[in-house]
């Protein structure tokens, strides 16, 4: 592994842990915002971080915030060497918006289809969607940087 690759991995890890720590501190607030947003969108009642769906209760818990996926995404973006900060910030706002909207849609699908089939099956199958979205955003980041000739690969 070249020195440049080692530096990139180190930068990625540092940024990942910084963003993960920040997001973990905000996780309770993010859960509250998700609960309120989802209950308003679906016209459902809620209590704390629980949404009442008929006779069932769906809890919006820590993994529902996508903190890990967001931190991985941000670590990747901010760890990218030789890219001006303005591009990193702009793309981070774009990417976090996509992840958040996808997450809200994911939870809506879980809520809507959890009554039809086994809840755990629905949850596990639909929850898989966020990770490929984050991977696509990382690929698209490099694609944009190459297209704009901000970074060059050999």
UniProtKB/Swiss-Prot annotation:
It is found in: Cell membrane. GO terms for molecular function: peptidase activity. GO terms for cellular component: plasma membrane. This is Probable archaeosortase D. Its main location: membrane. It comes from the Archaea. One of its GO terms (biological process) is proteolysis. It comes from Methanocaldococcus jannaschii (strain ATCC 43067 / DSM 2661 / JAL-1 / JCM 10045 / NBRC 100440) (Methanococcus jannaschii).
């Amino acid at each position: 592994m070249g020195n440049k690759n080692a530096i990139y991995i180190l930068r990625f890890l540092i940024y990942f842990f910084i963003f993960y720590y920040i997001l973990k501190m905000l996780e309770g607030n993010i859960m509250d915002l998700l609960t309120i947003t989802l209950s308003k969108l679906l016209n459902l009642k809620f209590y704390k971080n629980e949404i009442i769906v008929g006779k069932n209760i769906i809890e919006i818990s820590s993994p529902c915030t996508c903190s890990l996926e967001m931190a991985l995404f941000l670590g990747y973006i901010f760890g990218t060497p030789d890219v001006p900060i303005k591009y990193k910030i702009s793309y981070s706002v774009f990417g976090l918006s996509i992840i958040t909207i996808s997450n809200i849609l994911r939870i809506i699908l879980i809520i809507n289809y959890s009554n039809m089939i086994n809840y755990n099956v629905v949850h596990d199958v639909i929850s898989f969607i966020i990770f490929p979205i984050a991977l696509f955003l990382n690929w698209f980041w490099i694609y944009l940087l190459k297209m704009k000739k901000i970074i060059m690969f050999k």
